[in-house]
From Swiss-Prot:
PROSITE patterns, sorted: ZINC_FINGER_C2H2_1, ZINC_FINGER_C2H2_2
InterPro entries: Znf_C2H2_type
Any GO molecular function: zinc ion binding
Lineage: Eukaryota, Fungi, Fungi incertae sedis, Microsporidia, Unikaryonidae
Zinc finger residue extent: C2H2-type: 299-322
Keywords: Metal-binding, Zinc, Zinc-finger
Protein name: Zinc finger C2H2 protein ECU10_0150
Amino acid sequence: MDTKGSLADKIDIFFLLKQQKLITKKELGMLLPTQSYEDYRVNYYRRRVPEVFDRNFRKEWFIYRYLDDFFCEERRKAIWNIYSFKIEGPCIIARNISDDVPGSVINSAFSQCVNLERFWIQHQTSQNGFSRLCYIILKKEASVQESIDFMRSVLDRKLGIELEEFDISGVVEPKILSDCNDYDTAMSIFSSMCRMFDINEEEVLKKYSSALGDTSTRQNTAEFICNALKNVFLYCYTCAHQYDDPLEMMMGCRNHKTTDAAARRREFLSSHQEFGYLDVKTKEEELNNMTTIVNENHYKCGFCGKAFESEKFIFNHFNNKHENEIRRIEKGIENFKKFICRIDCFVLGIIEGTDDDRIPKFILPNIKDDRVVYDMGAVFSGEIAIGK
């Protein structure tokens, strides 16, 4: 059975560009050998990045993480300070946080707790959907129950947020698995992360090396760079995930291992480029989309349906009668520009379709040359006989 031949008949570049999962250079070479991978990748992002933005820009979790300044500023500060994996105080977990709850509401409520050391909102996506949790780390001698009672008193009960103590005993700093052959990929990922967060690569490596207190440490090794990824960006080279807090990384990497899905994430991130090439529509282009040309000298407003004899008249109408809609368009353009400058590994996983470990089904038969794929319908029909 010629599996590759049957796939080639069904898959073209237009099919691939419509998918919600990016494929690797090797996979594209097996499916469409003459297709430029760079052209495919650029055009995939041109479609997919605005699509993810349009689907999420009104959602509170998205606003908190990518459009408000607080989260981004706090993360940049933490990166420059180099993360520590020492946790002394007890921990509380907040469950059942709807994605409609503004991050500012959560921030305001938990920040009032005098026993608070720090907290963060954890965002998770998977094939089962989107979820939010909040981990609250208290000061060393704090009373957990008193802290829970206080936070319950300041939270709106209608939100339905559940608070309980979370046991972190036995959680330790993760060990990153790497070998000498991983240096180039790890270094490329570190460079990508520096570009992503607008961090000077040389300066942050110098600061990290200084924080180690060991000037003899060899920086041109995979071990050094993989640990720098961990301590600077909370990025695990083994499972190829970035985390928002050291405790989250400690829990997420307890039983981690390298997988085909992790290798895909590493490959995409190692060649990551900024999205300055994306087309950001202007206000005039957006208004043109709201103009219907019925025929010559007949223009129709997409907001209210009113007709005009010329473009000049309809644009005057937009400015005079649809100020709110124009402000909304201008705000949308501003927010999209913010978003493409703040794309991180979390939303990159959504964009590239690597936020779960499923490999795209349409390339599965071609991943390994020695894999045998059977058409089970044909097997059971008797068309194919499997000998012993």
